[in-house]
């Protein structure tokens, strides 16, 4: 297969794109906890109906096709999330956060929930199930193995294969999508095709008994929640390899877009590598005006994911509106999403990890009643830590983010000189890692204003927490932002946000109540528009003038009283998934998350 840029960042130009089961899979599945191995034919014909129930296993119907591993239930859904990232084990951005936080909230509402993701590293808490499956890849078969751990009410399933594990080493050099930022592995198409097919096997062949309420396989009455381009073909595999053979008859798929800019565009000639029937080719077919990964006709995984899913979602209502608004913000798939429809649900956040009343990284812990004084003390500690003059009366602006075009670090860097001319006294702390050119921009700002600006261009989780607690204003200069997590973290710590008016920032930040809006910035990642620089500088000036006033103290309180947990979003997700009408699916019950987020070794960008 030719060299491919599988997660190529899509720019904004016009485009025109809108057998036998054994051929695809051999079912060499070993049963977990002593279950007998199934022959290929038995595995293919097995129809389970595992339902969420209080560990009550009924006997199989005599004379029917149902095996002994049948669990019936009175409530709840079987939900299987599939994604390339799953925090805290693997994460490069919002996708990992969602698959880390949303599933436990769904489980707390009484649903049986699984997440399937690659095993990029030797995760110390994931155990070998001894269950294997052979997946059709190209002209041969690849054997995958399933690892499992049960955390916060969720079955975390890791697909083990050298295509995943051999790319990631230790905690500092691991790369999920490519060896360096902006460069993809040549075989990403094969890697994530393997993930999709393995994820479809997991609910049927894994007999999981860790949950105190559910036992046995998940069965076939399942809702698969696919996430981003890496899972685009899953619906096609479901239809061609299973439903056409009477398996997963009532299963449904939802496809969630976390970032439309990464679509999985490949050479059109690579379609046969997917081992899908010709009837799905039109769903992948795509033409754009770019030379990467090849010039001309391509296949587009995200396009197929959108068209073949039963429901399409994204991570905020305003981002959903932006995606269908035109080519520029819909990245050439706007016409497809107008056809299918799209639902936006704002993300939550992990309120146990980001909690100023318990945060071990900050100098002074606080809640809403003590926030104003505590934040002043934390500011002084932050100033001392980064080497700025210690003075609680100097407004402190912070920027935290990945240093890539989406987050607008170049716009922020360009706005700093203007802001310094407009405001007599201000300090700025910049934290982030990413592309070297952006790192140099931030360091250059520090060199130009050594007594007022500090740039930290390395990963530092402790400093990120300290900045949230000590900053007066959080600057978010995103060109586009599907949902955004940084502003939620800021509000959790009582730090109002000065943000671009895009995506989830519009849905979560209220002008004058919890932050300040700059207006929409240009999505052209190749230039820094002077008008955008002015928007950033003038909005930060406006925010700085409010710092220290009664109005600002009220904003701090407004931020901290927000419910930013996954509880509300999980209920919205439940309503959408129930609308798919999967057999046996019923509303869950409201509950609390089972345990705080575990801290494990993670795979990072």
Swiss-Prot record:
Enzyme class: transferase
MF terms (GO), sorted A to Z: alpha-1,4-glucan glucosyltransferase (UDP-glucose donor) activity
Record's keyword terms, sorted: Amyloplast, Chloroplast, Glycosyltransferase, Plastid, Starch biosynthesis, Transferase, Transit peptide
A GO cellular-component term linked to this record: chloroplast
GO biological process, one term: starch biosynthetic process
Residue range covered by the transit peptide: 1-72
Main location: plastid
Binding residues for ADP-alpha-D-glucose: 91
Keyword NADP: no
Role noted for this protein: Required for the synthesis of amylose in endosperm.
Protein's UniProt name: Granule-bound starch synthase 1, chloroplastic/amyloplastic
Organism this protein belongs to: Zea mays
Organism ancestry: Eukaryota, Viridiplantae, Streptophyta, Embryophyta, Tracheophyta
Name of the gene: WAXY
């Amino acid at each position: 297969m030719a060299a491919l840029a599988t997660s190529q960042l899509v720019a904004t130009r016009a485009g025109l794109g809108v057998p036998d089961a054994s051929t695809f899979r051999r079912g060499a599945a070993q049963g977990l906890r002593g279950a007998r191995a199934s022959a290929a034919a038995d595995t293919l014909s097995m129809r389970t109906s595992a339902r969420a129930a209080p560990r009550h296993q009924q006997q199989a119907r005599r004379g029917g096709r149902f095996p002994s591993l049948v669990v019936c239930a009175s409530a709840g859904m079987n939900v299987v999330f599939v994604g390339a990232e799953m925090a805290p084990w693997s994460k490069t951005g919002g996708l990992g956060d969602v698959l880390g936080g949303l599933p436990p909230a769904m489980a707390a509402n009484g649903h049986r929930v699984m997440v399937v993701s690659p095993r990029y590293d030797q995760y110390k808490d994931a155990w070998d199930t001894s269950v294997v499956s052979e997946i059709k890849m190209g002209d041969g078969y690849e054997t995958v193995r399933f690892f499992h751990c049960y955390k916060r009410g969720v079955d975390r399933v890791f697909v083990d294969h050298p295509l995943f594990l051999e790319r990631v080493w230790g905690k500092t050099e691991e790369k999920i999508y490519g060896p360096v930022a902006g460069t993809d592995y040549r075989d990403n198409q094969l890697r994530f095709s393997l993930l999709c097919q393995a994820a479809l096997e997991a609910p049927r062949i894994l007999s999981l008994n860790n949950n105190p309420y559910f036992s046995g396989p998940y069965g076939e009455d399942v809702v698969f929640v696919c996430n981003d381009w890496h899972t685009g073909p899953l619906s096609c595999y479901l239809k061609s390899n299973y439903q056409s053979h009477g398996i997963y008859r009532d299963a449904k798929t939802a496809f969630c877009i976390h970032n439309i800019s990464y679509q999985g565009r490949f050479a059109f000639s690579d379609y046969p590598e997917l081992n899908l029937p010709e009837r799905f080719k039109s769903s992948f077919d795509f033409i754009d005006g770019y030379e990467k990964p090849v010039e001309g006709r391509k296949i587009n995984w995200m396009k197929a994911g959108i068209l073949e899913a039963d429901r399409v979602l994204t991570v905020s209502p305003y981002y959903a509106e932006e995606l269908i608004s035109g080519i520029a913000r819909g990245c050439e798939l706007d016409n497809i999403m107008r056809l299918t429809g799209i639902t936006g649900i704002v993300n939550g956040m992990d309120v146990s990890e980001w909690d100023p009343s318990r945060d071990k990284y900050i100098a002074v812990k606080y809640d809403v009643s003590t926030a104003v004084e505590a934040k002043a003390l934390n500011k002084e500690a932050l100033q001392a830590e980064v080497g700025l003059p210690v003075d609680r009366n100097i407004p402190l602006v912070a920027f935290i983010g990945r240093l890539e075009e989406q987050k607008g670090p170049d716009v922020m860097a360009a706005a700093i000189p203007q802001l310094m001319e407009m405001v007599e006294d201000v300090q700025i702390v910049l934290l982030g890692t990413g592309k070297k050119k952006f790192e140099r921009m931030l360091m250059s700002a520090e060199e130009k204003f050594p007594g007022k600006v500090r740039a930290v261009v390395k990963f530092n989780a402790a400093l990120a927490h300290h900045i949230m607690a000590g900053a007066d204003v959080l600057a978010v200069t995103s060109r586009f932002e599907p949902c955004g997590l940084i502003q939620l973290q800021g509000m959790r710590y009582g730090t109002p946000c000065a943000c671009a008016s895009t995506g989830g920032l519009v849905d979560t930040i209220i002008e004058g109540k919890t932050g300040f809006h700059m207006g929409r910035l240009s999505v052209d990642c190749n230039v820094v528009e002077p008008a955008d620089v002015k928007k950033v500088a003038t909005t930060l000036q406006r925010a700085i003038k409010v710092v220290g006033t009664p109005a600002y103290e009220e904003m701090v309180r407004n931020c901290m009283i927000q419910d930013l947990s996954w509880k509300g979003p999980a209920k919205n997700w439940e309503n959408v998934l129930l609308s798919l009408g999967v057999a046996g699916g019923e509303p869950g019950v409201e509950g609390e998350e089972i345990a705080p987020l575990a801290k494990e070794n993670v795979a990072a960008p």
